[in-house]
């Protein structure tokens, strides 16, 4: 039985790599929602749509939350992703895509959960949190894969939080309270997977397709940033690693835990005493994940 996914994306470079890998791996992408994060939400939706279309996927893309639950000001530009989330290679937002709250309402995500569609969330959890506020019963014991958390490494958010949690910590807290039971794939794990620059370069040299050339344009500054942050010659495709966790769960090890927001470090997650409310990925077969992602991306 093929994997069916609802995907939530904030339109960055690693989101694009994740979408391509999923579309080329036989996954049935049932629906996609966009959220603010690496760029503003309309741009994130446009990025997702053009990546999927160039990958041969016709899934509908909906425009979700443009700001977090607390409505804090959002800075659109992120180092490594650029103003449009794709370092100038993003889709055109001139075509207005349908909003998530019409015609389905945020019930679109609840419907996915009720129908047994798996979830993959690669940005701030605002859309999921809003959906859980309206229909909490739909998400009881749903186990979406969520790219979130930085436990023993530092992320790019204030206090060392990962960017997704830092962007809307209230949303993640709400999701944990709802009983969703997410499978968290933190930076501790995603930072162990490297896709080498040469793999992107060879693909760009061997293929002149618009998709490959756009990805090559997008990954350049992203690789530069990762070289400075993490070392090595390549990038840590954080969201693509989360996608790999949905695709190949046998390559990832999880531990049940009770997690919450650290009150002293804004947006940072910590393990605390209590009944498990999430599963935390603690180990990954990094070399095999890297190999499979490269094969999915470049053939």
For the regions a language model picked out, list residue spans one by one.
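Conformational coupling and interaction surfaces
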Residues: 2-4, 18-24, 28-29, 163-170, ...
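Active-site histidine-anchored catalytic micro-motif
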Residues: 2-46, 50, 91-191
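Generic structural signal for helix capping and beta-alpha/helix-loop junctions
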Residues: 39, 69-71, 192-194
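Metal-dependent C-N hydrolase catalytic cores
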Residues: 45-115, 265-266, 275-294, 298
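Proline-centered flexible-loop/turn and helix-kink motifs
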Residues: 57, 115, 136, 180, ...
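A residue-level signal for conserved active-site and pocket-lining positions in enzyme catalytic cores
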Residues: 61, 175, 243
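Short, well-ordered secondary-structure micro-motifs
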Residues: 72-75, 132, 156-157, 195-198
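Short, surface-exposed amphipathic charged segments that create phosphate/polyanion-binding patches used
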Residues: 74-82, 158-162, 200-202
């Amino acid at each position: 039985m093929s994997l069916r996914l609802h995907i939530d994306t904030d339109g960055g470079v690693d989101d694009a790599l994740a979408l391509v890998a999923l579309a080329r791996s036989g996954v049935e992408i049932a629906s996609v929602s966009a959220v603010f994060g690496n760029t503003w939400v309309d741009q994130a939706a446009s990025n997702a749509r053009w990546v999927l279309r160039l990958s041969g996927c016709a899934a509908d893309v909906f425009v979700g939350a443009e700001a977090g639950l607390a409505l804090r000001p959002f800075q659109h530009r992120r180092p490594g992703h650029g103003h449009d989330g794709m370092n100038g290679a993003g889709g055109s937002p001139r075509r207005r895509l349908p909003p998530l709250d019409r015609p389905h309402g945020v019930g679109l995500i609840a419907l996915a959960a009720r129908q047994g569609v798996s979830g993959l969330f690669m940005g701030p959890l605002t859309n999921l949190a809003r959906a859980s506020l309206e229909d909490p019963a739909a998400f009881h014991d749903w186990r979406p894969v969520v790219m979130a958390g930085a436990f023993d490494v530092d992320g790019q958010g204030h206090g060392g939080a990962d960017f997704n949690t830092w962007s809307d910590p209230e949303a993640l807290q709400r999701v944990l309270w709802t009983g969703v039971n997410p499978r968290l794939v933190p930076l501790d794990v995603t930072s162990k997977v490297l896709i080498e620059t040469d793999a992107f370069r060879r693909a760009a040299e061997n293929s002149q397709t618009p998709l490959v050339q756009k990805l090559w344009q997008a990954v350049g500054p992203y690789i530069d940033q990762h070289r400075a942050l993490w070392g090595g010659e390549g990038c840590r495709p954080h969201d693509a690693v989360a996608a790999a966790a949905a695709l190949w769960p046998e390559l990832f090890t999880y531990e049940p835990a009770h997690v919450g927001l650290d009150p002293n470090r804004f947006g940072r997650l910590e393990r605390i005493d209590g009944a498990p409310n999430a599963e935390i990925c603690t180990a990954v077969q990094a070399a095999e994940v890297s190999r499979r992602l490269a094969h999915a991306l470049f053939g």
